[in-house]
């Protein structure tokens, strides 16, 4: 058995099974290597979407940097074998400045770069991340940082936008109307998870504070908003407000829809509310879809 010098890293590697590289016969320079993806012949079908998923990259949501999870895709003609996937991240890097700004205009420019680099007509992106914002306690007005989950979806064909979507997931308080009605005092309440997927008009300018308007529709219609910091006067106000505004899951999604339907820059929306029931072992949920 060969003895290795265990005082060196290389010796320890070989002691644990590493071997020297072989003398290869295939090309080692890029220009000499076969580019299978660029093979051109009849491959029977064109592909609508091909790309990468779960790409984690820094993003900027308003003034905060956070981690974004991306899915990028392009089309592929039937006479091309595949895409050069490394060009996707190269396209992203051209727009990187301490993060990719999560705004539709920035994502549109990324997709236009992707189209050019991939030499394809269609391109799309979905990216999700945490949205952080200032949240003030309702009575003492103490500032802290709240958060919600946002997902942007955008697709283009040529220079035309074919898909423009924003999804927000936020947590709220819901107090049970039935419990309030039948009980001598108090009522059970729980945390509700509200998800709103909006379909944004592709031909109309969107308002500047669109995220805040959607979030306000989600939170203001609940029994109460959630706050990072609550002092005793705040807790009293939150508790009493919830009791004053009882909501079933059915009530909440209908009230949210009534606000969203007034936004002329939306073509439609999907709403789901899921209550993590405090007196059951199961959750309660309701869903609603609307198209103008």
Swiss-Prot record:
GO terms for molecular function: GTP cyclohydrolase I activity. Its EC number is 3.5.4.16. Keywords: Hydrolase. One of its GO terms (biological process) is tetrahydrofolate biosynthetic process. The record marks 176 as: May be catalytically important. It catalyses: GTP + H2O = 7,8-dihydroneopterin 3'-triphosphate + formate + H(+). Pathway: Cofactor biosynthesis; 7,8-dihydroneopterin triphosphate biosynthesis; 7,8-dihydroneopterin triphosphate from GTP: step 1/1. It is an enzyme of class 3 (hydrolase). Converts GTP to 7,8-dihydroneopterin triphosphate. Belongs to the GTP cyclohydrolase IV family. This is GTP cyclohydrolase FolE2. It comes from Staphylococcus aureus (strain JH9). The gene is folE2.
